[in-house]
Amino acid sequence: LYSGAFSLILLFIWNYICHQWEIKNLPAFSGILFCGKNEAARLQEKIGKIYGMHKAIKEVVADINGNQNWQSCADKYDLIFIGAELDISAKEQIICYGRSAKKQMFIVPTMYEMACKNTSLIIADDIPMQRITRLLLTAEQKILKRMLDISVSIPAIIILLPLMALTTVAIKADSKGPVIYSQKRVGQYGKTFKVYKFRSMKQDAEAQSGPVLAKEGDSRITKVGRFIRATRIDELPQLFNVLKGEMSIVGPRPERPFFVEQFIKEKPEYAYRHNVKPGITGLAQIAGKYNTTAYDKLIYDLIYIQEVSIKTDLIIMLQTLKVLITKESTKGVK
């Protein structure tokens, strides 16, 4: 297991070097964005950050229905970006055009597109059907994942004990209240458990407000709290949750029951993420930010469940180390 992890570290370093070379030698190109009106500004901003493509989107078409000139508009560009809010008919037209015109295309997936990922073909007489993957782990995957959790969490606890001791002293010196903060979260199969964290907020921070997501520049966060949140040190006690079998090293982040109820009302498919154990880190944490929308995080979580493997978990662990030095990833909601 450890030799495999070392090989993955070398592979990660090599991929990073190749990625940086690709960015520096990327040829100039331009693109067109087809999307819904409500997502246009956000997608244009986000796509502009890819590979430093600040001027990648030259034109935005909010709706192709009734627009007879959309193909001639697209002819001028190298890339086509497709938003999530377009209806299926519009997406089909754009994709058919893009393939015939040999355009490079990118699409923001919806739950429907996610469900069609990694499907297998079934022939019913002469009718092709796709078998949609169930969002469940096999018995073998569960065993291997548990073995990885134990083999990582025990050495991590031993190595990080001095850091956790220093954090304990710093929290005690900085503000009144307990060092360890436990909070009810929703875990696998919807069962609740208490997650452990180093306290980063003032004692009884939500006594009057009730459950509230942390905001950027939140006054409830202590001085030490800002540092341990930025470096994710506040999450270290969750290694004991992993040892207890309540969490995994990698998986969807556990959320509070109050917010889970809200999210499920808005998006019933949010419940799918409870088919696996919650994690200390996950694909949503390395690909998104703290203030990434719940829906976008859900897409990442479902991608992870479909792609789960020991290799995937090890890659996410390594990517997490890179994310730790990015302050923007820990900013609160605005």
Question: Where do the model's predicted regions map?
Answer:
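A hydrophobic, helix-centered structural microdomain
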Residues: 141-204, 241, 310, 316-334
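N-terminal hydrophobic signal-anchor/signal peptide
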Residues: 16-161, 332
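C-terminal terminal-structure detector
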Residues: 244, 258, 269-334
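Transmembrane alpha-helices and immediately adjacent membrane-cytoplasm interface residues
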Residues: 1-25
